[in-house]
Amino acid sequence: MIVATFSGSKGGTGKTTLAVSVSVVVSALVSTLLVDASAEGGATAYLLGDAPPPYLREDPERSLRRVEAEGLRVFVAVNRGALTNVEAVARAVEGWAARFEFLMLDIPALTDVDAVERYMPLLRLADTVLVVTEPNPASIEASLYTFGGKRVVVALNSPRPYPKTIVDHYARVISGFCRRTLEKGITADYVLIPYDPAVSRLGPSTFKVLNYTSEQFDSAVMRLASLLLRKK
């Protein structure tokens, strides 16, 4: 199962934090690889801190590291810097799909048409696209797309506090998007991810912070993980 994250041109949606959280949860069930395809190396920093090279952009196979933390079985393809040969990374991902049961591709915000084209080899490999969006008009407009016939799971994420009325409004917007997508014969689901201040403190030395997230957050992430593990 290959999942690619997508937030359109909008950064700051909490996409990487959510990709890390889901990967940690899924790794308790199946062999998991989180591929950090962003120039900033956000997923790498969350799970491994200042990881040394070689990085994904230089040598995909040698970029694989295991997260050495109690109870975790997740691997990370570490990265720093922009990918210069996305096709080579895509070939590596195809090979890794035979070794890992679940791959999460953390793709950065795609700020222009050139960026979309550059990362298309990774998006094409995905069985499911995880759209991470916020309850605000700019984020919704930037991210609610379909990808051919690929399954879409939308996470309406609150990386900062939002009024319930606002969240409820955009939940209805996303519900309508999923309904219209289903009418086209494309599988679409959505999950509401509530704001949780503990998640912002996640880091390689603070994995135990996940023991202090709210029941609502934990339940939402578990539901998201369950949807992503579903074949169709």
Language-model-detected regions and their locations in the chain:
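Beta-strand-loop-alpha "switch" segments that mediate conformational coupling across diverse proteins
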Residues: R160-V221, L227
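Switch II (G3) loop of P-loop NTPases
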Residues: A77-A82, A92-Y119
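Walker A/P-loop NTP-binding active-site region of P-loop NTPases
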Residues: I2-E61, F102, I107
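Conserved beta-strand segments of the P-loop GTPase G domain that flank and frequently precede/overlap
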Residues: V35, V76-V78, M104-D106, V129-E134, ...
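Inter-motif core of Ras-like GTPase G domains
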Residues: A115-N136
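Switch I (G2) and immediately adjacent beta-strands of P-loop GTPase domains
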Residues: E61-G81, W96
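Conserved C-terminal guanine-recognition region of P-loop GTPase G domains, centered on the G4
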Residues: I140-V152
